[in-house]
C-alpha cells in the first residue's frame, strides 16, 4: 500500500490519497471469525485476512464481489488482505480499518500546520491527530475551488467552506486541534451510520474530546465516509445508544463534526470533499 500521493481534484481541491498494489478480484464465501474470511479467487478457495474486525454483516454476504491486496510477504499465513466490497445499489465500499486514518493523515499534510502529530496522548487516551497552527496564518487552510466552477453544487461547497472555517474560530496566538477519525461503512437509504457494532472506545473518545473543549482545544470528530453516494453520518442508536448520547453531548459542548465523503476505487481511496 502506498501513501502520500497528492492529487488535484477537478475543482482545484488538493487531496491526499492512498493506493493499493497487486489488487485481485474475488467472490466472498463466508467469514468464520473477525479476522479471516474464505474467498474464491480464480476458482480456488483462499483463506484471507479481513482488514476490519467490525461486523460488516450488511456488506460481507455470500457471493458478493470483493477486492483483495496480495501480500508481498511469502511468510504470511494469509496471502491476501480483503479491503473492499461491492454493495448492490451503492457501489464499492472500502472496509480497510487502517484506510481512514491514513487518508486523513495525507489530507492534513497538505495544510500548513506547524505541528501534526498522529497518535497523540491526551489524558488517558490516544487521539488520532494533534495539530497546531499560528493564528497569524490565513484561516482557510481547507481550500476549495471558486463557486462558479462547481456546476450546480455551489451551495453545498459554500456550506462546507463555512463549516470548516467555523472550526478555526478560537482566541489566542496558537490554534490547538485534536482530531479523532471514525470510518463509516454502514449505509441505509443513502445515509451513513456509525458504529456498526457497540464501541465503548468510541464513547470514551467523544468524552475526551468534550473535555478538550474545556481546556481550550479545537476538538473535531471526522467521519471518513468510505463509500459513494453518502455525505452524512448519523449515530447508529439502535446498535449503540450510548455512542449517540455521547455524540450529542460532544456536539453541544462545541466539538465540531466533519463529514468527509471519499472516492473509492478498487485500487485506493481519497477524500473527495
State where each predicted segment sits:
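Domain-level recognition of nuclease-like catalytic cores that cleave nucleotide substrates
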Residues: 16, 227-273
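Conserved catalytic cores of phosphodiester-cleaving nucleases, focusing on short active-site segments
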Residues: 26, 128-145, 152, 169-196, ...
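Short, charged beta-turn/beta-strand-edge "cap" motif at the junction between a beta-strand
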Residues: 30, 70-75
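Short aromatic-glycine-enriched beta-strand elements
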Residues: 34-38
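Beta-strand/loop nucleic-acid-binding surfaces
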Residues: 45-57
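Short nucleic-acid-contacting surface segments enriched for D/E, G, S/T with interspersed K/R
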Residues: 55-67
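Acidic-basic catalytic patches of nuclease active cores, encompassing PD-(D/E)XK
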Residues: 57, 89-118, 136, 142, ...
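Nucleic-acid nuclease catalytic cores
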Residues: 181-183, 187-200, 207-239
Amino acid at each position: 500500500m502506498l501513501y502520500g500521493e497528492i492529487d488535484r481534484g477537478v475543482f482545484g481541491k488538493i487531496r491526499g490519497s492512498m493506493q493499493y498494489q497487486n489488487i485481485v478480484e474475488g467472490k466472498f464465501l463466508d467469514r468464520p471469525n473477525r479476522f479471516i474470511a474464505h474467498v474464491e479467487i480464480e476458482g480456488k478457495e483462499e483463506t484471507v485476512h479481513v482488514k476490519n474486525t467490525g461486523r460488516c454483516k450488511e456488506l460481507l454476504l455470500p457471493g458478493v464481489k470483493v477486492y483483495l491486496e496480495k501480500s508481498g510477504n511469502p511468510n504470511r499465513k494469509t496471502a491476501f488482505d480483503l479491503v473492499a466490497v461491492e454493495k448492490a445499489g451503492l457501489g464499492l465500499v472500502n472496509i480497510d480499518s487502517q484506510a481512514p486514518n491514513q487518508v486523513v493523515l495525507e489530507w492534513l499534510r497538505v495544510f500548513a500546520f506547524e505541528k501534526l502529530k498522529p497518535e497523540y496522548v491526551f489524558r488517558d487516551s490516544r487521539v488520532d491527530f494533534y495539530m497546531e497552527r499560528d493564528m497569524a496564518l490565513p484561516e482557510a487552510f481547507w481550500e476549495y475551488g471558486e463557486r462558479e466552477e462547481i456546476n450546480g453544487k455551489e451551495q453545498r461547497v459554500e456550506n462546507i467552506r463555512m463549516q470548516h472555517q467555523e472550526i478555526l474560530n478560537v482566541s489566542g496566538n496558537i490554534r490547538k486541534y485534536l482530531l479523532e477519525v471514525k470510518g463509516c461503512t454502514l449505509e441505509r437509504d443513502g445515509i451513513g451510520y456509525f458504529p456498526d457494532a457497540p464501541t465503548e472506545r468510541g464513547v470514551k473518545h467523544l468524552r475526551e474530546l468534550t473535555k478538550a473543549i474545556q481546556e481550550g482545544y479545537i476538538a473535531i470528530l471526522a467521519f471518513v465516509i468510505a463509500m459513494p453516494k453518502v455525505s452524512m453520518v448519523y449515530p447508529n442508536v439502535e446498535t449503540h445508544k450510548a455512542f449517540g448520547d455521547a455524540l450529542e453531548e460532544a456536539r453541544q459542548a462545541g466539538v465540531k463534526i466533519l463529514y468527509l465523503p471519499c472516492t473509492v476505487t478498487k485500487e485506493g481511496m481519497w477524500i473527495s470533499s
